[in-house]
């Protein structure tokens, strides 16, 4: 895998399905070829008050890594990532007396998947409890493993079919420092699958907070 950038796309005077259809036409016009579909989902569990300070565990799955389960423990002061196999899902059901699932906040992004040269493009319709929340575009540049080395190329590519919605500056996620005592940021670090998961969690959290009604996708 390479470096992945996530970009929300505004739904203006269109349904979710119309927005996806519009973007599909743009992507196909580039010469991209559809290669199946994708799915990224997230379910959140919260610890019961009786065991002390509240902790949250986010469980995510990505169809690009079907054998892996990604979990992120949020202690309130820091986030601890963990990558395991599918048995972790079973473990979460076994500890349900301690961690309870917020079923109403289960969220996912799914849609068509395209290949265009060295780029992988995914057009995601984001839904939470079957309610449409927005459109999230994922672009991966597969030959590169360090975001700072290919951001300008990815920015130009993203702006080519998403327009001015794409900022000229690299997403804030990549500006995070790896070590508090250095200026080494995630943009200069080797990209890992957990970085894609962290970006999805960041956007999913924003969508969960969203209260403005969004036009539902047409079937």
From Swiss-Prot:
PANTHER family: MEDIATOR OF RNA POLYMERASE II TRANSCRIPTION SUBUNIT 20, UBIQUITIN SPECIFIC PROTEASE HOMOLOG 49. The gene is MED20. Keywords: Activator, Nucleus, Transcription, Transcription regulation. Component of the Mediator complex. It is found in: Nucleus. It comes from Aedes aegypti. Its main location: nucleus. GO terms for molecular function: transcription coactivator activity. This is Mediator of RNA polymerase II transcription subunit 20. It comes from the Eukaryota. GO terms for biological process: regulation of transcription by RNA polymerase II. Belongs to the Mediator complex subunit 20 family. One of its GO terms (cellular component) is mediator complex. Component of the Mediator complex, a coactivator involved in the regulated transcription of nearly all RNA polymerase II-dependent genes. Mediator functions as a bridge to convey information from gene-specific regulatory proteins to the basal RNA polymerase II transcription machinery. Mediator is recruited to promoters by direct interactions with regulatory proteins and serves as a scaffold for the assembly of a functional preinitiation complex with RNA polymerase II and the general transcription factors.
């Amino acid at each position: 895998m390479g470096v992945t950038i996530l970009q929300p796309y505004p739904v203006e005077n269109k349904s979710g399905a119309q927005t996806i259809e519009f973007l599909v036409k743009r992507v196909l016009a580039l010469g991209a070829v559809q290669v199946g579909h994708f799915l990224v989902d997230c379910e959140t569990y919260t610890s019961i008050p009786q065991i002390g300070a509240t902790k949250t565990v986010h469980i995510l799955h990505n169809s690009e890594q079907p054998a892996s389960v990604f979990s992120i423990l949020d202690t309130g002061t820091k986030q601890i990532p963990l990558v395991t196999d599918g048995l972790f899902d079973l473990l979460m059901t076994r500890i349900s007396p301690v961690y309870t699932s917020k079923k109403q906040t289960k969220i996912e992004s799914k849609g068509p998947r395209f290949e265009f040269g060295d780029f992988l493009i995914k057009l995601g319709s984001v839904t939470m409890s079957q309610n449409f929340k927005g459109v999230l575009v994922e672009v991966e540049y597969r030959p590169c493993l360090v975001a700072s080395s290919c951001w300008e190329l990815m920015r130009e590519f993203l702006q080519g079919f998403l327009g001015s919605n794409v900022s000229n500056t690299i997403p804030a996620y990549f500006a995070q420092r790896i070590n508090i005592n250095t200026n080494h940021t995630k943009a200069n670090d080797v990209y890992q699958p957990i970085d894609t998961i962290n970006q999805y969690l960041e956007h999913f959290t924003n969508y969960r907070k969203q209260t403005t009604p969004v036009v539902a996708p047409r079937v």
